[in-house]
Amino acid sequence: MASVNIKPLEDKILVQANEAETTTASGLVIPDTAKEKPQEGTVVAVGPGRWDEDGEKRIPLDVQEGDTVIYSKYGGTEIKYQGEEYLILSARDVLAVVGK
């Protein structure tokens, strides 16, 4: 995972999606048009968190750089930066952290 010069704001998370499967268990090749959108990725950068209701301190996020996360199928904004594709997600779009 390369370092990226993108810093998410507030409770946003920058994720690089894991590649979708290209073949089935039996060896059939899945065409691009039939691939499901991936819902798992690696956290590349994390914002500082949102402010509490009083605006006095930040509420930290539950994920950190390097975590593998599962996120909502249609959540986030897809971006392309220096030839790589990323997803900017809100913290609420992250459903789970995959154990190591």
UniProtKB/Swiss-Prot annotation:
The lineage of its organism: Bacteria, Bacillati, Actinomycetota, Actinomycetes, Mycobacteriales. Belongs to the GroES chaperonin family. GO terms for cellular component: cytoplasm. SUPFAM superfamilies: GroES-like. The keyword Cytoplasm applies. GO terms for biological process: chaperone cofactor-dependent protein refolding. It is found in: Cytoplasm. Signal peptide: none annotated. This is Co-chaperonin GroES. CDD domains: cpn10. One of its GO terms (molecular function) is ATP binding. Keywords: Chaperone, Cytoplasm. It comes from Nocardia farcinica (strain IFM 10152). The keyword Cytoplasm applies. InterPro entries: Chaperonin_GroES, Chaperonin_GroES_sf, Chaprnonin_Cpn10_CS, GroES-like_sf. Together with the chaperonin GroEL, plays an essential role in assisting protein folding. The GroEL-GroES system forms a nano-cage that allows encapsulation of the non-native substrate proteins and provides a physical environment optimized to promote and accelerate protein folding. GroES binds to the apical surface of the GroEL ring, thereby capping the opening of the GroEL channel. It holds the Pfam family Cpn10. Its main location: cytoplasm. Heptamer of 7 subunits arranged in a ring. Interacts with the chaperonin GroEL.
